[in-house]
Amino acid sequence: AHIEGRRVMVTGAAGAVGREIVRQLATLNPYQLILVDQAESPLYDVQLELSDHWKNLEVRVLVADVANRTRMEAIFEETRPQLIFHSAAYKHVQLMDDFVSEAIQTNISGTVNIADLAGKYRVSRMVMISAANARHPENAMEYSKRVAEIYVQSSDCRLKRDTGETDMFIVRLGEVYPTNTHCLITLSEACMLTLEVGVMG
């Protein structure tokens, strides 16, 4: 699943992880980057950064909520991504304990939508960005990520059985520097490893 010459979608493209993935993808000569996020101002900042540094790169910027199935299906129908990095999620532990329904809607329903559409539109590879603590969840955010992981795993098994055309992977990212100064891995390094999963599996 080489990136060069391919249409690559990044959900959550305006977040810290998504934005770094976008930066690194831009250096790998994709045919088109499809950037999806519901935060319009940060997404516009990403668009400006790309236009400043990669003037010849074809970029589609789409304001959308991954939990909106109808909107996401229209985006897949129009853009036909070949590779997806699914980074869109709520990640704040304390806030998601206060707004559990939002964690469920975005982290679970949003991931269900992306996984289903990846299979329907025969995307070559989907990489879900999860959280290290999803292994032993203790709060709403971590439980929502774990449920989303299980859905992606089951979708991967089903697609391998039925079509063999879409591979799905999960990458669990922990705390990274400079967000957490006690970490031994930087955000850039974490995203580089994530891209390697997208390319090599």
Residue positions per predicted region:
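N-terminal Rossmann/SDR dinucleotide-binding element
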Residues: 1-80
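Feature representing long, continuous alpha-helical segments
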Residues: 15, 70, 112, 146, ...
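Short acidic, glycine/proline-enriched helix-loop-strand junctions
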Residues: 45-59, 83, 121, 144-146, ...
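Alpha-helix termini
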Residues: 51-54, 156-163, 201
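Conserved sequence/active-site signature of Rossmann-fold short-chain dehydrogenase/reductase
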Residues: 67, 134, 176-178
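Conserved Rossmann-fold NAD(P)-dependent oxidoreductase catalytic core, especially the SDR/UDP-sugar
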Residues: 80, 86, 90-146, 154, ...
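Conserved beta-loop-beta element that borders a ligand/cofactor-binding pocket
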Residues: 125, 152-178, 182
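Alpha-helical substrate-binding/gating segment
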Residues: 181-201
